[in-house]
A protein has these predicted regions:
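Short conserved micro-motifs at the rims of enzyme active sites and ligand-binding pockets
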Residues: 29-31, 128-129
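Short, compact, well-ordered microdomains
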Residues: 96-131
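A short beta-strand micro-motif
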Residues: 5, 15-24
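Short, Lys/Arg-enriched N-terminal segments with co-localized hydrophobic residues
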Residues: 1-12
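Short, conserved turn/kink motifs that form compact alpha/beta structural patches or helix kinks used as
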Residues: 47-106, 110
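Catalytic phosphate/metal-binding cores of nucleic-acid and nucleotide-processing enzymes, i.e., regions
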Residues: 12, 23-29, 36-58, 113-116, ...
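Conserved ATP-binding/catalytic motifs of P-loop helicase motor domains
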Residues: 134
Length: 134
């Protein structure tokens, strides 16, 4: 269990948030560079999410659970996810390279509410949640 790894009382009182991202690997990156952003469903979803609309990515199951963040709130998730504070609060999933929290990413709280990292702040997009694993 994740709590066993945590040592301070403050961290034990924090919540666990799930970070979801649309992963662009080298192969997809090469394809995007050759054919443009409309070349693949993940690329199009990534572009749309970066512009504030995660609908296509959520509906088409393009998001991957890349990390758990042990934080107090969404703002704290943004800080921890971008390298500020204790590295123990950022628990990446196996096989995932170090990542940062960016516009277009999704953060799910312990209540199951889904939040889009927007250009300024966060937006609740729980109503778009349709995939069983999210």
């Amino acid at each position: 269990m994740l709590y066993i790894q945590l040592e301070t009382r403050e961290m034990l009182m924090s919540k666990i948030f799930k970070l979801y991202q649309i992963v662009i690997d080298k192969q997809l990156s090469d394809l995007i560079n050759t054919e443009g952003w409309d070349c693949h469903i993940d690329a199009l979803s990534y572009r749309n999410a970066s512009e504030g609309d995660p609908t296509f990515g959520i509906i088409n199951d393009c998001y991957t659970h890349v990390a758990d963040l042990v934080c107090d709130d969404l703002d704290h998730c943004f800080e921890v996810g971008n390298g500020y504070g204790s590295a123990d609060r950022f628990v990446k999933k196996t096989g995932v390279n170090r990542t940062s929290v960016s516009v277009g990413d999704l953060i799910e709280d312990e209540d199951g509410l889904l939040h889009l990292v927007d250009s300024i702040g966060f937006r609740n997009v729980t109503h778009l949640k349709t995939t069983p694993h999210m």
